[in-house]
Amino acid sequence: MSDLPGIVVTGASGRMGQMLMRTVLASDKARLVGAVERPGSEWVGRDAGAAMGGAAIGVTVTDDPLEAFAQAQAVIDFTSPEATVRFAELAAQARAVHVIGTTGLDPAHLEKLEWAAHHAVIVRAGNMSLGVNLLTRLTQKVAEALDADWDIEVVEAHHRMKVDAPSGTALMLGEAAARGRGTDLDRARVSGRDGITGPRAPGSIGFSAIRGGDIVGEHDVIFAAAGERIVLRHVATDRAIFARGALRAALWGQDKRPGQYDMIDVLGL
C-alpha cells in the first residue's frame, strides 16, 4: 500500500471534501495520507474517518497544509479562490500534483497559479466529470459548424448553497462556444439579463443561473435559430462523479512535467 500515490484532500469537512476522501479510501490505486481544514474548524485534530461518522482511518485532520503536502504525491482541492492560491504555492514547494476544482478564480488568482505551474503539475477544470468534458467538446464542435444566425445561451442550475454564478462549468462551456465561434468570451458574454435590455446583441453568448434545493448540477447549451433549436444537456445526480474525475486527474499527473493541464488532457479527448 505504501507505494501507492498519497493523496491529501483540502476542505475536508465540506460535502466535496468528504466525498473526495471516501473516493480515495475506496480506491485500490491511491491512499489518503492527509486531510486539511481551516484553522479553528472543529474537525482539526480529529481522525478524518471518525469526523465523517465512520471508523477511524489513522489520518488526523490538520490546519497545517505544508506539513500535510510534504508527505503527499497529490493534493485535491475544491475550496475557495484565496485558499487555492495559497495551496498552489505550497503544493509547488512539495512538488505535489495539484488538482483544482475550485471555481470563481479571477485573473489575479490565475496569474499566481501560472507561477506555481512552473514547479509542479496543476490540473484545473471547472468540472471533473467525463460527461461534462464530452459536452465541452461537443459544444465547440457545434459552435464551429453553425453560423452566426444561431444564438448561444448557457443555462445552469445548482443547489441553494452555491456562492458563485455562473458556475465554473457554465463558463467552461461558454469558453468552448466562443472558441468554436472564433471569438473571445469576455467580449461576447452577457450574464443575467434584467429589465429592458433591448434586442439580443449579435454574436453574444448568454448565461443564466438557477439556484435552489439540492440540485447537484445541470447545464444546458442552447443553440437557437429561426424555427429550430439544438439543446446539449448534462445532468449530474451524484457529486461522486466529480470526486472520481479528480482522483483520476491526480493519478494521471504523477508522471507529467510541470505545467497547467485540464480534464481534456486527462481524458485524452
Curated annotation (Swiss-Prot):
<dbReference type="InterPro" id="IPR036291">
    <property type="entry name" value="NAD(P)-bd_dom_sf"/>
</dbReference>
<feature type="binding site">
    <location>
        <position position="38"/>
    </location>
    <ligand>
        <name>NADP(+)</name>
    </ligand>
</feature>
<keyword id="KW-0028">Amino-acid biosynthesis</keyword>
<dbReference type="GO" id="GO:0005829">
    <property type="term" value="C:cytosol"/>
</dbReference>
<keyword id="KW-0521">NADP</keyword>
<feature type="binding site">
    <location>
        <position position="159"/>
    </location>
    <ligand>
        <name>(S)-2,3,4,5-tetrahydrodipicolinate</name>
    </ligand>
</feature>
<dbReference type="GO" id="GO:0009089">
    <property type="term" value="P:lysine biosynthetic process via diaminopimelate"/>
</dbReference>
<comment type="similarity">
    <text>Belongs to the DapB family.</text>
</comment>
<dbReference type="GO" id="GO:0050661">
    <property type="term" value="F:NADP binding"/>
</dbReference>
<feature type="binding site">
    <location>
        <begin position="101"/>
        <end position="103"/>
    </location>
    <ligand>
        <name>NAD(+)</name>
    </ligand>
</feature>
<keyword id="KW-0963">Cytoplasm</keyword>
<dbReference type="InterPro" id="IPR000846">
    <property type="entry name" value="DapB_N"/>
</dbReference>
<keyword id="KW-0560">Oxidoreductase</keyword>
<keyword id="KW-0457">Lysine biosynthesis</keyword>
<feature type="binding site">
    <location>
        <begin position="11"/>
        <end position="16"/>
    </location>
    <ligand>
        <name>NAD(+)</name>
    </ligand>
</feature>
<comment type="pathway">
    <text>Amino-acid biosynthesis; L-lysine biosynthesis via DAP pathway; (S)-tetrahydrodipicolinate from L-aspartate: step 4/4.</text>
</comment>
<dbReference type="GO" id="GO:0051287">
    <property type="term" value="F:NAD binding"/>
</dbReference>
<feature type="active site" description="Proton donor">
    <location>
        <position position="162"/>
    </location>
</feature>
<dbReference type="Pfam" id="PF05173">
    <property type="entry name" value="DapB_C"/>
</dbReference>
<dbReference type="InterPro" id="IPR022663">
    <property type="entry name" value="DapB_C"/>
</dbReference>
<comment type="function">
    <text>Catalyzes the conversion of 4-hydroxy-tetrahydrodipicolinate (HTPA) to tetrahydrodipicolinate.</text>
</comment>
<feature type="binding site">
    <location>
        <position position="37"/>
    </location>
    <ligand>
        <name>NAD(+)</name>
    </ligand>
</feature>
<dbReference type="GO" id="GO:0008839">
    <property type="term" value="F:4-hydroxy-tetrahydrodipicolinate reductase"/>
</dbReference>
<dbReference type="GO" id="GO:0019877">
    <property type="term" value="P:diaminopimelate biosynthetic process"/>
</dbReference>
<dbReference type="InterPro" id="IPR022664">
    <property type="entry name" value="DapB_N_CS"/>
</dbReference>
<keyword id="KW-0220">Diaminopimelate biosynthesis</keyword>
<protein>
    <recommendedName>
        <fullName>4-hydroxy-tetrahydrodipicolinate reductase</fullName>
        <ecNumber>1.17.1.8</ecNumber>
    </recommendedName>
</protein>
<dbReference type="Pfam" id="PF01113">
    <property type="entry name" value="DapB_N"/>
</dbReference>
<feature type="binding site">
    <location>
        <begin position="125"/>
        <end position="128"/>
    </location>
    <ligand>
        <name>NAD(+)</name>
    </ligand>
</feature>
<dbReference type="InterPro" id="IPR023940">
    <property type="entry name" value="DHDPR_bac"/>
</dbReference>
<feature type="active site" description="Proton donor/acceptor">
    <location>
        <position position="158"/>
    </location>
</feature>
<feature type="binding site">
    <location>
        <begin position="168"/>
        <end position="169"/>
    </location>
    <ligand>
        <name>(S)-2,3,4,5-tetrahydrodipicolinate</name>
    </ligand>
</feature>
<keyword id="KW-0520">NAD</keyword>
<dbReference type="GO" id="GO:0016726">
    <property type="term" value="F:oxidoreductase activity, acting on CH or CH2 groups, NAD or NADP as acceptor"/>
</dbReference>
